Amino acid sequence: MCLSGGRFEFGVGAGWNREEMANHGTDPRRRMAVLQERVEAMKAIWTQDEASYHGQHVWFDRIWSWPKPAQRPHPPVLIGGNGPGVLDRVLAFGDAWFPNYAPEGILDRAAELRSRADRPVELMVMGVPADAKVLQAYAEAGFRRAMHWLPLARRGPVERALDRFEAAVAEFDGE
């Protein structure tokens, strides 16, 4: 049985709102370690018929969970974030880096990630502007997907934003 036809991707991030994390029971000072263990635990559940995981923050014995994901060995894990340790997290337990767009630094960090990786790491970016030159620069740096934020507004402004992004994509594609 496969619910998504093998299209599921598991996107995670360590978070930024410390008050919200504390309100949900996560000590913000330990969030990076908690995130890593939670991802490792999910990988155990996805890949083992009878999964156990014993970490400092996540601990369980002999659980069963089905259906298993269609992707082997597990769905891609997309690590979001722009913080100083994000590349280490991608290399430790991720399959892709999914930063927020920033006009400076992301392309250099993508090159650093690729040079440090001993395996393919997918690159995608969230929040790009409607600008063909930006899309081109990210594509040349190895980014394969770019997401564009839409305004929280009525239909007219949203449609205009979509039109601008569509025009940028068309210019980037050479249409």
Spell out what each predicted region is.
Residues 1-175:
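Active-site-adjacent structural elements that line small-molecule/cofactor binding pockets in enzymes
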